[in-house]
Amino acid sequence: MQDYKIKIENVVASTQIGENIDLNKISREIKDSEYKPKQFPGLVLRTKEPKAAALVFRSGKVVCTGSKSVEDARRAVKQIVKMLKEIGISVIDEPEVKVQNIVASADLGVDLNLNAIAIGLGLENIEYEPEQFPGLVYRLDNPRVVVLIFGSGKMVVTGGKSPEDARKAVERISEELRTLGLM
């Protein structure tokens, strides 16, 4: 397999830490928290190591974003749970963390003719309107992801549930492009 410099850019994960979470108390007691209920119903907590941001909702749902790996997302959630326990908020000790989305970047290392690719890959799974957006949008079923392909050969893979989904998508696309003689 060729090295396409696949890099995880963002992991979005969610969990349930309890119910009836007192966001006002968290806002008062954790100085770096952000809570503006008139603008948005969630409270923002940030972790420094690993670097991540978490939206905490009164319902107990937590959405963690900004991690560079699934493990970092889990570590960030653990830190959030610890922070909340320290100020007396009743939360689940080890909540189940579920990956919702992984965004990865990759580089095929060659310039691409997106017009030829749009025709070659078949228009049913492709959106390409260069006047609207410079990238070609390719929807894959297996793995179930959306890939943005740019003329520079760079790609963004989104919608995956594991790092493996990004790797499979990049390998599949590079193989399809090679088979079509477009790479």
Curated annotation (Swiss-Prot):
Swiss-Prot/TrEMBL keywords: DNA-binding, Repeat, Transcription, Transcription regulation
Sequence repeat locations: 8-84, 99-177
Domain of life: Archaea
GO molecular function: DNA binding; DNA-binding transcription factor activity
Family: Belongs to the TBP family.
Biological role: General factor that plays a role in the activation of archaeal genes transcribed by RNA polymerase. Binds specifically to the TATA box promoter element which lies close to the position of transcription initiation.
Protein name (database record): TATA-box-binding protein
Native organism: Archaeoglobus fulgidus (strain ATCC 49558 / DSM 4304 / JCM 9628 / NBRC 100126 / VC-16)
